[in-house]
């Protein structure tokens, strides 16, 4: 068998991004054959990805890419906050955002089949799972085209993209507003009907407990609903930099119109797994006793 040299390990690592020890093991198993060792690692990394695929990914990053009148916002998830700061993970997310803007995939499946360099997005994702040891998923994305665009990222956990006409500074302020106040829609008319119905139901229950006449109760309910609509629609919110005016008034003063926006918050709506360390240890002890 050929001697396994440091240069061979380094060459295999450069090709596969696998950890050094994994590269050495693969070369040993392949008896020094680089091509065979690369194939062994591809299989191993794929197996790691398969094992990791069932694990919850509630951490991650939001990335934005804007080029002229085309842009994209994407959320890519991982398992831990630590990995969300990994350079390879961040580079992958930024490449994905750029690819979405340039290629206009219909959905995550179509995106996964596109290429980053010589590999598909899915192949790169699988390789990174094997290298880093955590599950990673492309959760969602939104693409914009044919309009002025601006984006705002609050760190890597909150991202907003705004389609607008007019002044970019004002549009950027609107994006920052969305990141800070997290509206669910652009205008009150756009608030999803199910959210309005839920808020109305809560308001009706509270108003009914007041014991006031029906006509007063009806006004109380309507007042509560209108207040809610103003709180959750971007244009109707008090502007965070000057609460004496609404976002809509701020934009109008700058001759700017926001046509649409997308807001992503990392892990929003994903139920995180709560680890019970004591229960985990107890289970391991019980399993060990059964094997004894």
UniProtKB/Swiss-Prot annotation:
It comes from the Bacteria. Residues 80-83 are annotated as: Involved in Mg(2+) ion dislocation from EF-Tu. Pfam families: EF_TS (PF00889). InterPro entries: EF-Ts_dimer_sf, Transl_elong_EFTs/EF1B, Transl_elong_EFTs/EF1B_dimer, Transl_elong_Ts_CS, UBA-like_sf. The keyword Secreted does not apply. GO terms for molecular function: translation elongation factor activity. Gene3D superfamilies: 1.10.286.20, DNA helicase RuvA subunit, C-terminal domain, Elongation factor Ts, dimerisation domain. GO terms for cellular component: cytoplasm. It is found in: Cytoplasm. Keywords: Cytoplasm, Elongation factor, Protein biosynthesis. Its main location: cytoplasm. The keyword Cytoplasm applies. Belongs to the EF-Ts family. PANTHER family: ELONGATION FACTOR TS (PTHR11741), ELONGATION FACTOR TS, MITOCHONDRIAL (PTHR11741:SF0). Associates with the EF-Tu.GDP complex and induces the exchange of GDP to GTP. It remains bound to the aminoacyl-tRNA.EF-Tu.GTP complex up to the GTP hydrolysis stage on the ribosome. This is Elongation factor Ts. It comes from Ralstonia pickettii (strain 12J). The gene is tsf.
């Amino acid at each position: 068998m050929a001697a396994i040299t440091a240069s061979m390990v380094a060459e295999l690592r450069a090709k596969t991004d696998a950890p050094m020890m994994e590269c050495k093991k693969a070369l040993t198993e392949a008896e020094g054959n680089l091509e065979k060792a690369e194939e062994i690692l591809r299989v191993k990394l794929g197996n790691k990805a398969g094992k990791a695929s069932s694990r919850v990914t509630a951490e991650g990053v939001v990335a934005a890419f804007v080029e002229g009148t085309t842009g994209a916002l994407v959320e890519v998830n991982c398992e831990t906050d630590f990995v969300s700061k990994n350079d390879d993970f961040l580079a992958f997310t930024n490449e994905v955002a750029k690819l979405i803007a340039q290629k206009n995939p219909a959905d995550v499946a179509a995106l996964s089949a596109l290429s980053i360099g010589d590999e598909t997005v899915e192949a790169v994702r699988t390789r990174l799972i094997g290298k880093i040891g955590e599950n990673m998923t492309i959760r969602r994305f939104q693409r914009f085209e044919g309009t002025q665009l601006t984006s705002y990222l609050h760190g890597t956990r909150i991202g907003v993209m705004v389609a607008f006409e007019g002044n970019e500074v004002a549009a950027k302020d609107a994006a920052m507003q969305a990141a800070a106040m997290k509206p669910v829609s652009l205008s009150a008319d756009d608030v999803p009907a199910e959210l309005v119905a839920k808020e109305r139901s809560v308001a009706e229950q509270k108003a009914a407990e007041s014991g006031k006449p029906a006509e007063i109760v009806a006004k109380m309910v309507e007042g509560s609903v209108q207040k809610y609509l103003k709180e959750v629609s971007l244009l109707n919110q008090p502007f965070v930099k000057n609460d004496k005016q609404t976002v809509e008034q701020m934009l109008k003063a700058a001759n700017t119109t926001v046509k649409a926006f997308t807001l992503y918050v990392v892990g929003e709506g994903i139920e995180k797994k709560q680890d019970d360390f004591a229960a985990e240890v107890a289970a391991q002890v019980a399993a060990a006793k059964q094997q004894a």
